[in-house]
UniProtKB/Swiss-Prot annotation:
<comment type="similarity">
    <text>Belongs to the transaldolase family. Type 1 subfamily.</text>
</comment>
<comment type="subunit">
    <text>Homodimer.</text>
</comment>
<dbReference type="GO" id="GO:0005829">
    <property type="term" value="C:cytosol"/>
</dbReference>
<keyword id="KW-0570">Pentose shunt</keyword>
<dbReference type="InterPro" id="IPR001585">
    <property type="entry name" value="TAL/FSA"/>
</dbReference>
<dbReference type="GO" id="GO:0005975">
    <property type="term" value="P:carbohydrate metabolic process"/>
</dbReference>
<keyword id="KW-0808">Transferase</keyword>
<dbReference type="InterPro" id="IPR018225">
    <property type="entry name" value="Transaldolase_AS"/>
</dbReference>
<dbReference type="GO" id="GO:0006098">
    <property type="term" value="P:pentose-phosphate shunt"/>
</dbReference>
<dbReference type="Pfam" id="PF00923">
    <property type="entry name" value="TAL_FSA"/>
</dbReference>
<keyword id="KW-0704">Schiff base</keyword>
<comment type="function">
    <text>Transaldolase is important for the balance of metabolites in the pentose-phosphate pathway.</text>
</comment>
<dbReference type="InterPro" id="IPR013785">
    <property type="entry name" value="Aldolase_TIM"/>
</dbReference>
<comment type="pathway">
    <text>Carbohydrate degradation; pentose phosphate pathway; D-glyceraldehyde 3-phosphate and beta-D-fructose 6-phosphate from D-ribose 5-phosphate and D-xylulose 5-phosphate (non-oxidative stage): step 2/3.</text>
</comment>
<dbReference type="GO" id="GO:0004801">
    <property type="term" value="F:transaldolase activity"/>
</dbReference>
<dbReference type="InterPro" id="IPR004730">
    <property type="entry name" value="Transaldolase_1"/>
</dbReference>
<keyword id="KW-0963">Cytoplasm</keyword>
Length: 316
């Protein structure tokens, strides 16, 4: 019998949640996802030093203002890392918009267009790029605009059903509902561990997946943020799963049958009217876990973006 990673690939598109080229070459995923924390981690690897240098040189040609140079270097570094990753995968790279723009629709749209232009200028076409945005109301509205321009988006930091519903109604290409971070919250609150089949993060993604399929939404569901392979295996059959290298290694080393847990019902039920802004805020606010985790996720990504900028500033 083949290992669990090989079996999972037959049911689900496997995506690598990393910016590290060696790991991507090893596990040969379809796609790869990055975020500010992963870019910061990758930037500290020696083999990426030339990419940082090239990004700084680019920034110096764009502006004499140091603050602007730092911004341009960070953007180009994310794109340069993305370009390297695209050499090793057949699919798409997800590159994230600065988390500090999470509540700024116009700023998010402008930054996304800038990142896509950087990729396009390097010969990378839009069908190989996903722009990551936080699943705030403003982020979802930004994605709605970008999708109409042919820029596909990956809506991340998704913790509530309200966020998932709003994303589908906006016609976004893909969502990344988080699993492990949801479980973390409930584990801390209830003081207990959860079996994979009762894991609150697993149940959240399952509910979202079934809802999308029931109403025939085309938005791709890509489970993210896993703490163990049990969570991953409970979501076998999900459209895509983005998995960190350590868990890919664990799946590769594991023997035993992988059972399809999520099945597309191919429904075509009449869809409810799209949520208003007020309805979205009210429904999202009913979920204290989601409110806390969305805010925390944005803050943490912003902190790591700041660390990356400090690292770049020291090199300018």
């Amino acid at each position: 019998m083949s290992n669990k990673l090989e079996q999972l690939r037959k049911l689900t598109t496997v995506v690598a949640d990393t910016g590290e080229i060696d790991a991507i070459k090893k596990y040969q995923p379809e796609d790869a996802t990055t975020n500010p924390s992963l870019i910061l981690k990758a930037a500290q690897i020696a083999e990426y030093a030339p990419l940082i240098d090239a990004s700084i040189e680019y920034a110096k040609t764009q502006s004499d203002d140091k603050a602007q140079q730092i911004q341009d270097t960070c953007d180009m570094l994310a794109v340069n890392i993305g370009k390297e990753i695209l050499k090793t995968i057949p699919g798409r790279i997800s590159t994230e918009v600065d988390a500090r723009l999470s509540y700024d629709m116009e700023g998010s749209v402008a930054k996304a267009r800038q990142l896509v232009k950087m990729y396009n200028d390097a010969g990378i076409t839009n069908d190989r790029i996903l722009i990551k945005l936080a699943s705030t109301w403003e982020g979802i509205r930004a994605a709605e605009i970008l999708e109409k321009e042919g820029i596909n988006c990956n809506l991340t930091l998704l913790f509530s059903f309200a966020q998932a519903r709003a994303c589908a109604e906006a016609g976004v290409f893909l969502i990344s509902p988080f699993v492990g971070r949801i479980m973390d919250w409930y584990k801390a609150k209830e003081g207990r561990d959860f079996e994979a089949q009762e894991d609150p993060g697993v149940l959240s993604v399952t509910k979202i997946y079934n809802y999308y399929k029931e109403y025939g939404y085309k938005t791709v569901v890509m489970g993210a943020s896993f703490r163990n392979i049990g969570e991953i295996l409970e979501l076998a059959g999900c459209d895509r799963l983005t998995i960190a290298p350590a868990l890919l290694a664990e799946l590769e080393a594991a023997e035993g049958e992988v059972v399809e847990k999520l099945v597309d019902s191919k429904g075509a039920a009449e869809r409810p009217a799209p949520m208003t802004h007020a309805e979205f805020l009210w429904e999202h606010n009913q979920d204290p876990m989601a409110v806390e985790k969305l805010a925390e996720g944005i803050r943490n990504f912003a902190v790591d973006q700041g660390k990356l900028e400090a690292m770049i500033a020291a090199k300018l």
